[in-house]
């Protein structure tokens, strides 16, 4: 289905925070189910809730209560039963007993089954945290432990389950046996590429988080259930860690923190939720909310997989960690070896993603190369401009500091290349007169662009010259038998010729080719290099004259800059006052000029030739 986000490689996920009732698993399970039903209606296939959300995080020694732990199992069974007719895989937090140890766990519940349980690996016991008072670390499970039994919880029709007498009375109850460990990967068959891993709060804060290895093992979505009481500045720390994890892991990072309802005896809670994808924030909710909140976004699973293919070092890292170190032992645990992860398959029969038009829940930038945030845009412009300047400085120094020969038209690209060249000369301590700025009027050059070209070159202190190409172009067109040759001689269209034939692609390319030819010969004569002006948008579209034309130069400073960004770069140069006021006024005049190759004359009173009328808006071209 073309309009289905899932069929286009996306997966809808949610990070949820909601009010908890401390020490009341039944009430909390009911609240989770209510949210899960709403998320199912929204097409969500994976929903993460906060750490210990079935009991509340800040309940201290009540975590060790047998009554509470029994109520937790009953609440898990309630969630399991409710999940049978719900779409999303639910990831919820709860304390679970294994033998004589208690673990801080994340349970994955979906399709009427508890799919797996991931214990928290790293327990903070510093400052306001003292989790080792209650819990055992999940990175040190007893030898051979790979599953956990959940008394009173059913496994579903195809799960491992037995019955036992809970109190010796002879009455029996179901006991589900489910995978247990921090090395679980959950593969969603109906969403190609969606494999998720779960870690808990502090696991994100250690130098080598379990999620990093999970990503190397194939997880594309990394889930973190968090308690994380709020202190001043901690929200920024979470964002930094989630962003970093998603960027290094080439994955999505889904983060849900505890909020309303948690005890404020000595702690406070903000209920922050975040989803990052490959270092970019997809969504977040307000902090300190009144009531439940969910960050619901569509993760580009297909894009993440493609990025991993492009970045070969990602697979190299997984291979290195999975291989023995020379002279040392082979990796032995999940925490050193991505290959040690276990995969749990969620079949298409159990989780069938909607194949209907559910819209797209992610922000799509209209201008992908131009940030909306003014501060970020200014930073990008600063970096882009100085990258160009530094690169040109290096190139000039490496080839003996030749002069620069550049064709200036009064358009955006040649303007930007010229102000890059001017700054490069300043950095090198050379006079700007070593820049030979040559304008070459053709058959359609307007007075405005001709004036802007001269004002800019002279204002910058360049060596400015005019070389009119019309006579040479006319001679070439005449000698090759082009209709324009006879028209130029007689002023009358040749018999049978149309104006379209007169101003055809040959007419245009003769002018473009002559300009480039002159520039190269002038550079030869004066000991210079031709500085190319074509931008990334033109190169991507092939919107240039190939061979002897504007496709060719000795060095192209604009080749990595899209057209939509060049306009902002020039505005940034004006705003930063890098040049004097007269140059600034000329730059603003150039920005107000229609983008045109000026190769075909306008009819009397008609509009000038427009590039965007021919190839479409650059805003659209740069977007695609």
Model-found features: residue ranges?
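Enzyme catalytic cores with a strong preference for nitrogen-chemistry domains
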Residues: 1-405, 423-432, 464
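ATP/NTP-dependent adenylation/nucleotidyl-transfer catalytic domains that generate, transfer
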Residues: 28, 161-166, 192-195, 249-251, ...
């Amino acid at each position: 289905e073309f309009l289905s986000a899932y069929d286009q490689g996306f997966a809808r996920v949610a990070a949820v925070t909601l009010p908890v009732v401390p020490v009341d698993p039944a009430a909390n399970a009911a609240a989770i189910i209510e949210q899960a039903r709403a998320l199912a209606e929204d097409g969500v296939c994976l929903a993460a809730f906060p750490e210990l959300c079935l009991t509340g995080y800040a309940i201290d020694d009540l975590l060790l209560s047998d009554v509470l732990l029994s109520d937790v199992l009953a609440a898990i069974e309630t969630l399991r039963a409710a999940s049978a007719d719900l779409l999303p895989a639910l990831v919820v937090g709860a304390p679970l007993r294994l033998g004589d140890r208690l673990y801080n766990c994340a349970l994955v519940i979906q399709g009427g089954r508890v799919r797996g349980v991931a214990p928290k690996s790293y327990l903070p016991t510093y400052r306001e945290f003292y989790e080792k008072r209650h819990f055992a670390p999940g990175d040190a499970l007893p030898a051979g432990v790979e599953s956990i039994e959940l008394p009173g919880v059913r496994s579903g029709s195809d799960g491992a389950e037995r019955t036992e007498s809970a109190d010796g009375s002879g009455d029996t109850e179901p006991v589900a046996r489910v995978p247990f460990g921090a090395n679980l990967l959950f593969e969603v068959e109906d969403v190609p590429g969606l494999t998720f891993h779960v870690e808990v709060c502090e696991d994100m804060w250690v130098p080598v988080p379990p999620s990093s290895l999970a990503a190397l093992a194939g997880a594309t979505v990394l889930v973190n259930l968090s308690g994380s009481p709020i202190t001043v500045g901690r929200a920024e720390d979470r964002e930094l860690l989630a962003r970093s994890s998603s960027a290094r892991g080439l994955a999505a990072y889904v983060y849900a923190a505890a909020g309303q309802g948690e005890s404020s005896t000595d702690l406070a809670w903000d209920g922050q939720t975040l989803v990052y994808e490959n270092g970019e924030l997809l969504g977040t909710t307000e902090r300190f909310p009144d009531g439940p909140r969910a960050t619901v976004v569509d993760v580009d699973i297909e894009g993440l997989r493609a990025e991993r293919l492009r970045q070969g070092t990602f697979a190299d890292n997984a291979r290195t960690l999975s291989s023995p170190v020379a002279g040392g032992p082979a990796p032995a645990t999940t925490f050193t070896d991505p290959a040690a992860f276990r995969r749990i398959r969620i079949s298409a029969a159990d989780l069938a993603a909607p194949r209907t038009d559910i819209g797209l829940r992610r922000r799509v930038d209209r201008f992908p190369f131009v940030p909306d945030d003014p501060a970020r845009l200014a930073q990008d412009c600063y970096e882009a401009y100085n990258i160009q300047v530094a690169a040109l400085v290096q190139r000039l120094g490496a080839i003996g500091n030749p002069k620069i020969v550049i064709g200036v038209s009064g358009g955006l690209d040649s303007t930007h290349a010229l102000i890059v060249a001017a700054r490069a000369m300043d950095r090198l301590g050379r006079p700007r007169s070593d820049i030979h700025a040559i304008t070459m009027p053709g058959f359609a050059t307007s007075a405005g662009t001709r004036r802007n070209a001269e004002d800019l070159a002279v204002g910058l202190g360049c060596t400015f010259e005019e070389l009119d190409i019309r006579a040479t172009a006319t001679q070439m067109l005449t000698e090759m038998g082009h209709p324009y040759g006879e028209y130029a001689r007689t002023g009358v269209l040749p018999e049978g010729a149309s104006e379209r034939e007169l101003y055809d692609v040959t007419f245009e390319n003769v002018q473009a080719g002559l300009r480039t030819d002159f520039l190269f010969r002038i550079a030869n004569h004066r000991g210079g290099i031709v500085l190319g002006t074509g931008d990334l948008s033109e190169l991507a579209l092939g919107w240039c004259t190939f061979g002897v034309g504007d496709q060719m130069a000795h060095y192209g400073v604009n080749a990595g800059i899209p057209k939509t960004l060049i306009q902002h770069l020039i505005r940034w140069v004006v705003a930063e006052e890098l040049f004097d006021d007269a140059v600034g006024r000329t730059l603003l005049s150039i920005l107000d000029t229609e983008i045109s190759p000026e190769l075909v004359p306008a009819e009397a009173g008609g509009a000038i030739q427009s590039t965007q009328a021919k190839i479409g808006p650059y805003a659209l071209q740069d977007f695609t």
